[in-house]
Amino acid sequence: MTKKKKITLLLAAAVVALALAVLAGMIATRFLNLDTHREDLLHALRTALDREVLYREGSLSFRLQPTFTFTGVVIREKDGASDFITADRVTFKLAVLPLLKKNVVLRRLEMENPRIHLIRDRSGIFNIGNLFEEKKDRIALKARRIIIRNGRLSFTDRQILPEGLTTTLENLDLRIDHPERGRKAAFRISATVDDESKSGKLALAGTLDISGSTEPILSSRIDTSIRAERLNVGWYWPYYSRYVPFRKITGQLDM
């Protein structure tokens, strides 16, 4: 290679590097301050979740991939009267290429100290049921991995008892990979189970074969190992009473 060709290649490489640096600078300038795009961001999240979404502060870093961090996150229920999820911090890493197809794919979604409220009403409808519905006007939002650290999940079941039977998972740690309709998702869960002023421990690990978009979400199949300590079996009597030929069981279950 002649000296002239080497100089030409070096100049071309320098121009490309400069162009990439300028482009990165433009992107960083545009997005590092999320508050300037607060309304656009909230609109996208509201559309994807079909709920009001608020946050106190947000930041964005460009290391190996775009990483968004939000603090003071609040996701309202559909009626706006109560909170569905609150979290001290939510971090997610965004996959860039799916955006070209108008899809939002999160490589990793991590919630710290979230408080999650699940409800099943008297007709058997869950408050998260709408999140599994396919809608053409909804932004496609997928997460390849979801992680919960030190969470709290309360489940109130008004179908099993009209006044509501509430079970709470404290100190909840969860990891689930590829939680998508029609796919098999691997998961791990550990938590403290609080009910009727009693406390037990629960750990599960296995796979969830999630039903397709044309099937009810409750038709999903689960294959899991279970470890339990001091579970209050009497608290769950309404769920299994119809299947056993004896009176209410009391005591604690280890397995």
Residue ranges and their predicted role:
Residues F126-I128:
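Short, structured interface segments
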Residues L49-E57:
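A short, amphipathic edge element
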Residues R30, S59-G124, E133-D157, S220:
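Flexible beta-edge/linker motif
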Residues S241-P245:
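Extracellular loop and loop/strand-boundary signature of outer-membrane beta-barrel proteins
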Residues M1-D50:
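N-terminal type II signal-anchor transmembrane helix
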Residues R89, L131-Y240:
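Elongated, acidic membrane-bridging lipid-handling scaffolds
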Residues F246, T250-M255:
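Short, intrinsically disordered, charge-balanced linker/junction segments flanking boundaries
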